Amino acid sequence: MLVGGMGVAGAQAAPHVFFRVQLGSSVAGPVSGRLLVFLKQGKGDKEVNIQEFHPGETWVAAQEVHDLMPGAAVEMDADTVAYPKPFSALPAGEYEVQAVLDTAHTYNYSGRGPEDLVSGVVSLGQWNPGGAEATLTLDQHAEANPMRAQMLDKARAEAKPGELEKVEMESSLLTRFSGNAASIKAWVVLPPGYEKDASAHYPTVYFTHGFGANLDYDLVQGEMIRGRMVTGTMPPMIWVMLDESCAEGTHEFADSVNNGPWGKALTTEFIPMLEKKYRMDARATGRFLNGHSSGGWATLQMEVNYPEVFGGTWSTSPDPSDFHNFTGPDLYAPHANVYHRPDGTDYPIMRMDGKVVATLEQFTKIEAVLGPYGGQITSFDWVFSPRSKSGAPMQMFDHVTGEVNPTVVAYWHDHYDLAHLVEKEWPEKAALLKGRIHLFVGTADTFYLDGSAHLFDARLAKLGADAHFTYIPGRSHFDLYGVGNDRSGLFDQIAAEMYAVARPGVSWKK
């Protein structure tokens, strides 16, 4: 070919790989969404999907589709937006492929669900990229995860008024911010015997989930917590299972220029409403926080920013609380890059059994293909970043190169680096925060979150904050709560410690 019109001969580029994706004739249309095509080596699988613990095994390409009618088709160019490379870079081999239409733009947050349209898995046999064009027909809905569906069905069947109650309140603050009706949602878990003594009031725990979860997850967790109170392994308290999911990921109940005043709405609107409706201890020493992962960071920031409201947080495996270690990279280092260390080696983002299974660069670039909404990296920007001139959050780093934007990091530092905020505000908040921060994390945390926790711990120790940090040997992000054969045993310890603060010297065990 000719390069730049200068008559210089160049190597011929490989032809792009295309797939023909059509909407089944029996599917109601028109439909829109993000069209994803997944491809991997092999044959005979029921599903082809991204495996987060094996990020190089499956290739994925994407494009937006608008108003596709039944029987109509689109030509998917699998080279334009693809991971890990354009599909034309694939070697010849035996492959299988599947198409998914992410109709709700939620793939980055919760994966494929019943609202999404999928094709069957098509075996390409011995396939040469750029050769025969496969046709994929979107003619069925994705199946719900059977284990999750079973747990949710069981929880719904067992949720009874007076035991677990769904509460939703439209927030005037959030509605005014967004211009659309916006609500705070939760499941309220009432302790056994709540209905028998109209004079009894209870300590209250505000729980929030991690990234990828939602109100359905809260129901399942709430049912588990009530069961532990019924059997007597947890003290009688009211638990409010807050939903922090949103279209952009998780809002963390943080006050943000992008997501809105979620913290203010929770503390000035939702909690006062709940305390009128239920017999809760309406005082700081009777309000506690518990959350895991992104929910762990959310509960840390709520305690730091609203210590007059909450009497303590028990946060587990929280997202980074000191940005000198943001799952590894020091965001404040000169010429910081979140993909590569100064020596050029990759920053990992996930480990399993002591081995790196994914790098931060892989994690970010997969998310970018799946869609510019709802992913973990994008979610951080929606919570922490200033707004750009376009109205979207500014990216903390360049998603192609990994180079950090110092201007954005300075904003993150001033508003959301919790270690910095506690140090800055310690003279005013010491009396309220001392002894109230409890943090649990595994020494083998899957996302390296123990690193940031150690830095936060050290800075609180210098302040004399009487913080309580527990590093559980060998535990990862996903088995932290296990005690012996009990996968949720840590809840018992946390709840007992909270109850001792709310009811000093009072025994709750029968």
Predicted features and spans:
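C-terminal segment of classical bacterial N-terminal signal peptides
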Residues: 2-10
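Short linear motifs in intrinsically disordered
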Residues: 10-12, 158
